[in-house]
């Protein structure tokens, strides 16, 4: 009896156990803050784990209190240290601090979860009422305390940096990528935070930016020069996606640019008397025609308008040829004109159905008509 009584593990009072645990937590925080502190040894980690384990399996089960303490440790550190460090910084310095604090937070949660891992097994998994895991508690603390306060300011700084890059300035793309990853990771497995708190505002700003560009460029540039700028803008925006935006953003971003730089100015650009679509056909500007086709290909309704302009042009040329040529040469000239348009359809418009139909229509209206007249 006496030997059994002696073999029972000593009951750890909560204050005593927590005091020892707190020493390990203090060391972890000092390491995160960059203060001189040796790294954790396995023996230290195992000691902390053992204390917490014993406090859960003994007669006085402190698992619920430890679970609550785990949350409070993270909340206190965040409120007392993390938030003040963020509030005192601005612009890119604030973004760098935010990235640093997010990375530190993940490290803190990772280490604390190792120390408190038995809480997950003993309390969280056995609870009749679902309660968050230690990882979920840790991430929620950052979401509620840091993300909710800082995301709006961070969004504005990132959008300002994107604007600078669009104007030709170099920016820290890696920093922007790391900041946007915070939006993604705080979505808890979804892209809701990224889409609602950043992407929607960035797309709105993009539309405004390119609307202003379109207004200026349509006044300053010929149609070919304008289209070169549009092509370059689309290329640069797609590069932005590869460097720091989430891949889900690309189709939305491209659509915004297409709408502002192509859809909204179709008539102004393509029907310009001096440098529009008809003028490019007249001057045999195949590269410029190919560019227009490539740019409007993803916009079916506007590509149809381009095909209509092609039809209008070849109709006018066909009518003019019939009026000017004599009966002996008309048929040959029409064949030559038709062959010329075949080159455009194949080389510039990739034999697209819309343009192919225009060529067939030309054959029906002019060549067959001329054949029957003869």
From Swiss-Prot:
GO terms for biological process: ubiquitin-dependent protein catabolic process. Pfam families: Cullin. Disulfide bonds: none annotated. It comes from the Eukaryota. One of its GO terms (molecular function) is ubiquitin protein ligase binding. Transmembrane segments: none annotated. Belongs to the cullin family. This is Putative cullin-like protein 2. It comes from Arabidopsis thaliana (Mouse-ear cress). The lineage of its organism: Eukaryota, Viridiplantae, Streptophyta, Embryophyta, Tracheophyta.
């Amino acid at each position: 009896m006496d030997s059994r009584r002696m073999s029972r593990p000593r009951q750890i009072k909560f204050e005593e156990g927590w005091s020892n645990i707190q020493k390990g937590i203090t060391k972890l925080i000092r390491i995160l803050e960059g203060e001189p502190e040796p790294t954790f040894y396995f023996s230290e980690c195992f000691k902390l784990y053992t204390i917490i384990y014993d406090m859960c399996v003994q007669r006085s089960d402190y698992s619920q209190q430890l679970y609550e303490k785990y949350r409070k440790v993270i909340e206190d550190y965040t409120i007392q240290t993390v938030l003040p460090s963020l509030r005192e910084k601005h612009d890119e310095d604030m973004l760098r601090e935010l990235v640093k604090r997010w990375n530190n937070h993940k490290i803190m949660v990772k280490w604390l979860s190792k120390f408190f891992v038995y809480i997950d097994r003993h309390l969280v998994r056995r609870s009749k009422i679902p309660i968050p895991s230690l990882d979920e508690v840790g991430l929620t603390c950052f979401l509620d305390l840091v993300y909710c306060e800082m995301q709006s300011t961070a969004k504005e700084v990132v959008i300002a940096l994107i604007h600078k890059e669009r104007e030709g300035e170099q920016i820290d793309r890696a920093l922007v990528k790391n900041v946007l990853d915070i939006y993604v990771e705080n979505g808890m497995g979804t892209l809701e935070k990224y889409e609602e708190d950043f992407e929607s505002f960035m797309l709105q700003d993009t539309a405004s930016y390119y609307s202003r560009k379109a207004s200026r460029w349509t006044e300053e540039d010929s149609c070919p020069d304008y289209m070169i700028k549009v092509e370059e803008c689309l290329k640069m925006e797609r590069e932005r996606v590869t460097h720091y935006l989430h891949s889900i953003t690309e189709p939305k971003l491209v659509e915004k640019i297409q709408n502002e730089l192509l859809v909204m100015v179709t008539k102004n650009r393509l029907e310009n008397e001096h440098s529009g679509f008809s003028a490019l056909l007249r001057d045999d500007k195949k590269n410029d025609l190919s560019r227009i086709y490539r740019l409007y290909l993803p916009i079916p309704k506007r590509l149809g308008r381009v095909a209509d302009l092609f039809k209008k042009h070849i109709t006018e040329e066909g009518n003019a040829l019939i009026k000017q040529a004599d009966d002996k040469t008309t048929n040959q000239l029409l064949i030559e004109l038709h062959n010329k348009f075949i080159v455009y359809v194949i080389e510039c418009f990739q034999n697209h159905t819309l343009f192919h139909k225009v060529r067939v229509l030309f054959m029906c209206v002019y060549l067959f008509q001329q054949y029957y007249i003869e």
